[in-house]
Amino acid sequence: GGFQLTGMAAIDMACWDILGKKTGLPVYTLLGGKQQDKVKLYKVVTRTDPDAMAARIPEYRAQGYRNFQVKVGENPLTDISRIRKIAACMEPGEVLNADANTGWKQHQALIVADAIKDLPRERGLLLYFEQPCLTYEECLTVRRHTDLPFVLDECMDSLAALLRAHHDNAMDLINLKINRMGGLTRARQIRDLCVSLGLPMNVEDSWGGEIATAAIAHLAHSTPTEFQFQSSAFHEYSTVCIADGAPSVKNGYMSVADTAGLGVTPILESLTSVSEFS
């Protein structure tokens, strides 16, 4: 299951870090060598009032971002307003990724896709439609009814799932999430297959802090630029710092130092309970 794989991922990351420190090599070297000096990032626009979401775009652009992931997946009409208002604030050539995180039913996703289909031509932007529905079958149906570039995320949880989706021409990109694959070992295998298939990726994780971001950065650095579409620096969204030496973020890009292993040192004092759920 998902929690088991996430637990495996933490152990797997630690093993790669140990191997890097033992050999004196950065993890990106062990994963295939540095293919790019800096990794393109996107900025998440969290779901709230449409006008408030749109107001964030100039702020994030001033920080150097040109790729924006817009969280949708609620009421279709409200989501259409969110996407349209954000698109109106964007400049030609910028990337808008409408991410529903499985939140729509199939009929709702079809309504939204049809309502926003002309935005790329009207605004000169690059508009992507990400994981609109929960099941692979629903997503595939939506995919076959829209010309928008399509991203699969939650469905991409194994090598078999990737091969099936590629056979069905179900997507144009995938979100490659390290924790969902059980760590860097399996994620590298999926990454290499995507490169062989000519399939670009968002090199990612589901969430995390400095350590998860370092793993993302090393995998992304070792991925050819044309196949690493965008990534996220999760420690930028966190209020608790759990490690020193996190990747540096500047002008919408992330980079890691040429130090051995993942390049981060856990702050053991931070390993206390931050929050509790019941």
Language-model features: where?
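A cross-family glycoside hydrolase active-site/sugar-binding cleft signature
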Residues: 42-44, 69-73, 97-101, 130-132, ...
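Active-site catalytic pocket residues across diverse enzymes, especially alpha/beta-hydrolases
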Residues: 90, 120, 223
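Active-site-adjacent beta->alpha loops and helix N-cap segments on the catalytic face
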Residues: 50-52, 74-90, 104-109, 132-143, ...
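N-terminal capping/lid subdomain adjacent to the active-site entrance of alpha/beta enzymes
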Residues: 1-97, 101-110, 114-117, 241-278
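Non-catalytic positions within long, well-ordered alpha-helices that form the structural scaffold/packing
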Residues: 58-61, 117, 121-122, 166-167, ...
